[in-house]
Amino acid sequence: MKNKKGYLLLETVISSFIVITISISLYTLLLHSSKYKTSVEDRVELYEQGEEMCFQINKTIENSDGIISIRDLNGNTISGDTPSYVNVNSIKCKYKNSYRDVKDKEISYKRNHKLFINTLNSRGNSESGGYEIGDYVDFISVMIQGNKVAVKLSLSKNNEKYETYFKSYIKEF
């Protein structure tokens, strides 16, 4: 029998070191790719939610006969032009007139980070029900400039953030 003089132990240590290094590298690569995939999915979802909310809000405001009222987070009614964006809870739009018997609508922000479109009863209060148009909403802000309402939506999911801006034209305010 040959005497290898410790080479077997050295070969085992080197082989183990190489296997452990490759394993750690692959694990790190897998972990980072998983985080990146989640981040991209969150960004895409926020973008899609933002686009859908913009479409629904714009359609609701522009198809109305005007804005009834806009309320900020403190419950104060906003009237006239605003110099900057103001965070709001609700935007009430007038739909009912002498030619059509349709209920007025409200775009409302809920504290659970959701945005809803509700119908209003004859006293101007939200009826139960309504439908959710978006999720992950941090806040909705408006800036009124004449017959235009500039809307800013701020969304977030996990560590991803997304903001979108658009303008809606109103008939009367």
Model-derived regions: residue spans:
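Extracytoplasmic beta-rich ectodomain segments of secreted or membrane-anchored proteins
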Residues: 55-71, 78-82
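Type IV pilin-like appendage domain
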Residues: 71-146
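Short linear sequence signals and composition-biased patches located at protein termini or domain-edge surfaces
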Residues: 140-173
